[in-house]
Curated annotation (Swiss-Prot):
InterPro entries noted in UniProt: DEAD/DEAH_box_helicase_dom, DEADc_DDX41, Helicase_ATP-bd, Helicase_C-like, P-loop_NTPase, RNA_helicase_DEAD_Q_motif
Disordered, as annotated region: 33-88, 125-148, 617-636
Residue ranges of every copy of the Helicase ATP-binding domain listed in the record: 253-438
BP terms from Gene Ontology: mRNA splicing, via spliceosome
Name the UniProt record assigns to this protein: Probable ATP-dependent RNA helicase ddx41
Reaction(s) the record says it catalyses: ATP + H2O = ADP + phosphate + H(+)
Stretches with biased composition (Low complexity): 33-83, 125-139
Cited PROSITE patterns: HELICASE_ATP_BIND_1 (PS51192), HELICASE_CTER (PS51194), Q_MOTIF (PS51195)
Gene symbol of the encoding locus: ddx41
EC identifiers of the protein: 3.6.4.13
CCHC-type zinc finger segments: 635-652
Residues the record lists as binding ATP: 266-273
PANTHER family hit by this protein: ATP-DEPENDENT RNA HELICASE DBP3
Length: 671
């Protein structure tokens, strides 16, 4: 709305407010004039009688020496009064001029008084309009000033974040090495696909909601056969129910097989793990066929994961490919090392003696092996970071740098996650060469296959209400808790209620954690109770229901949690308990996610006041039902990608700006 139209609306409102007042004034004046016409003869007669009485009293007190004069005056006055009284009784056109002049003067005075009142009212209206305009202008100016202040503060924060060293090895920085070309591979897309027009390639991307960014992007390919994937691997995928590539695989696999560095962003359960594991297996197989490795050599490829469970899951997937290639394809047996805490190194000595082709690891155990000279990266040219935003976060930056310092040659670097804020993407690009970004859906968006149900539950009623929620869907069900104590309490409560349940958290041994996950996957147990250690990347295809016993401290953990259901195109339900203990910033982030995913927003979230322009536009446009909006409508937090707060109020940034023990305290056992 323009300033002129807004001012006009304000004037209209004030005029409407003053119209009744002016009407009342005019009605009062008309009433007074009517009364004046009716009362004028009586008032004039009374006035003449009073004057006559006063004159008589005066004449009585005067001495008799003027008797003749007094008598004459009294007679004259009486005669005039009688004439006026008689004149008043006549019709107005027969009244004397003096009486008409008196009435005219009276009416004129009333009209002048009315005009003064109306002028005064108009002045008040104008003053009120000007005052309102001034107040509104002051409010707009204050809002603009506050917006500029926040922008400047956020700019200072971003500048301080950009002072971090690039994500490259010490050797490359010391030698001032800058790679300008990506690694060359022998893989090529089929000729008929390469000969297609770029418009045809973009049409495929648009149909699958694939957004790409980069130079000379390889074409998307919609079948595994056209990607030249070996038949034994395709058979393994068919056994897992994967008949055709998912959107992230359609574009991601050709990019990586071409040797390009890549940032992959897609919702949970979209098949990201396959994108960076399968090319590594094919690359290691090609290198082994060229020149077999011997003791002390290897690996050719490395994948880093944020948790033991995710590393174990990735390791199992890689082994399924290598075993199929060896047994059904007649290819050499590739050896993969799982380097995570809780595994006795003596059990893995036979792998070190023969040489390692690939390593799946968590940073802590990997650094331990490097320090003990068990492995080296002289031949390693392939690095994948799963859940990359976690691995590159402030608390883990030094671990990643220490790993990179052991690389001696150029490598192909891949970063994948469901949540990767813009700031983390920019920081990660310092480790990439001519990267291609492949994005399926907005970074940090929830899986649209998941129905999100958010309920306000008092803390003391949560554990009892949990049993009712378990009845929504058949098993298996996954329950997430923020604290290890809550995991143990819920596990014991479910056992008392005769529910087949298992639990995992960071304090349990590796054997306990692996046996619990195995029993849950095999269907021997109906419920798995876990901390966020089970929320990152773990694949449970049959899960229909995820229950968040409490909200995580960061919204991105919520996205990872609910992503354990609704995988591989299936539908799922996520129930989340909220209460007054949750921070307003976190609840606003949740409110945004629900609106964006077209989910029902509970009254408890609708009542939270906020000045987020993006949320207000979404609500105005879609009636609180969601429905997407351009990212340009507002700026998300550039540190965590949350939309319910700004960078200056980012809870994650404040948390990680504190002592390191704050963020090493939870989940540190996985490192």
């Amino acid at each position: 709305m323009s300033e002129e139209s807004r001012k006009h609306d304000i004037e209209e409102q004030h005029i409407e407010k003053w119209i009744p007042l002016k009407e009342r004034k005019l009605n009062q004046i008309k009433s007074k004039l009517n009364n004046l016409k009716q009362q004028q003869p009586q008032q004039h007669s009374q006035q003449q009688e009073n004057e006559q009485n006063n004159a008589t009293a005066t004449n009585t007190n005067i001495t008799n020496t003027t008797t003749t004069t007094t008598t004459t005056t009294t007679t004259t006055t009486s005669s005039n009064n009688d004439n006026n009284f008689e004149d008043e009784k006549k019709p107005i056109y027969q009244q004397s001029q003096s009486l008409l002049d008196q009435k005219f003067e009276m009416i004129k005075k009333q009209e002048n008084k009315t005009q003064r009142e109306l002028q005064q009212g108009g002045t008040i209206i104008e003053n009120d309009v000007n005052s309102s305009n001034n107040n509104n202008n002051n409010g707009e100016e204050n809002k603009i000033k506050e917006e500029k202040r926040l922008d400047m503060e956020e700019s200072d924060i971003l500048k301080s974040l950009k002072t971090f060293k690039p994500l490259v090895s010490v050797k490359d920085r010391a030698k001032d090495v800058i790679y300008t070309d990506s690694i060359k591979t022998n893989w090529r897309a089929p000729r008929y696909i390469l000969e297609r027009d770029e418009k045809d390639h973009q049409k495929v991307r648009d149909q699958l909601n694939i957004i790409t960014d980069g130079e000379d992007i390889p074409p998307p390919i919609t079948t595994f056969k056209e990607m030249k994937i070996p038949k034994p691997v395709i058979d393994v995928l068919l056994e897992k129910g994967i008949k055709k590539p998912s959107p992230i695989q359609v574009q991601g696999l050709p990019v990586i097989l071409s040797g390009r560095d890549m940032i992959g962003i897609a919702y949970t359960g979209s098949g990201k793990t396959l994108v960076f594991t399968l090319p590594m297996v094919l690359f290691a197989l090609e290198e082994e066929c060229k020149l077999p490795i011997i003791q002390g050599e290897g690996p050719f490829g490395l994948i880093l994961c944020p948790s033991r469970e995710l590393a174990r899951q990735t390791y199992d997937l890689v082994n399924s490919f290598t075993n199929a290639l060896h047994k059904n394809g007649g290819h050499p047996q590739l050896r993969t090392l799982l380097a995570i805490g809780g595994i006795d190194l003596r059990e893995q000595e036979h792998i070190f003696k023969k040489g390692v082709h690939m390593i799946i690891a968590t940073p802590g155990r990997l650094l331990d092996l490097l320090n003990k000279k068990k492995i080296n990266f002289k031949l390693c040219k392939y690095l994948g970071l799963d859940e990359a935003d976690r691995l590159i976060d402030l608390g883990f930056e030094d671990d990643i740098r220490s790993v990179l310092d052991n690389f001696t040659n150029q490598r192909q670097t891949l970063l994948f996650s469901a949540t990767m804020p813009k700031k983390i993407q920019e920081f990660a690009r310092s480790a990439l060469v001519l990267p291609v970004e492949v994005n399926v859906g907005r970074a940090g968006a929830a899986n649209l296959n998941v129905t999100q149900e958010v309920e306000f539950v008092k803390p003391e009623a949560k554990i009892v209400y949990l049993l009712e929620c378990l009845q929504k869907t058949p098993p298996p069900v996954l329950i997430f808790c923020e604290n290890k104590k809550d995991v143990d309490d819920i596990y014991e409560y479910l056992l008392l209620k005769q529910v087949e349940a298992v639990s995992i958290h960071g304090d349990k041994s590796q054997d306990e954690r692996e046996s619990a996950i195995k029993a849950f996957r095999e269907g021997k147990k109906d419920v798995l109770v876990a901390t966020d250690v089970a929320s990152k990347g773990l694949d449970f295809p049959e899960i229909q229901h995820v229950i968040n016993f409490d909200m995580p401290r960061e919204i991105e953990n919520y996205i990872h949690r609910i992503g354990r259901t609704g995988r591989r195109g299936n539908k799922g339900v996520a129930t989340t308990f909220i209460n007054k203990n949750n921070t307003e910033s976190l609840l606003l982030d949740l409110k945004y996610l629900l609106i964006e995913a077209k989910q029902k927003v509970p009254p408890a979230l609708l009542e939270i006041p906020d000045d987020n322009q993006y949320l207000q536009k979404l609500q105005d446009r879609n009636g609180n039902t969601g429905g997407g909006a351009d990212d340009d409508d507002t700026k998300p937090c550039e540190y965590c990608d949350g939309r319910g707060h700004r960078l200056v109020n980012c809870p994650k940034l404040k948390k990680q700006a504190g002592p390191k023990r704050d963020f090493f305290g939870s989940g540190g056992g996985d490192w």
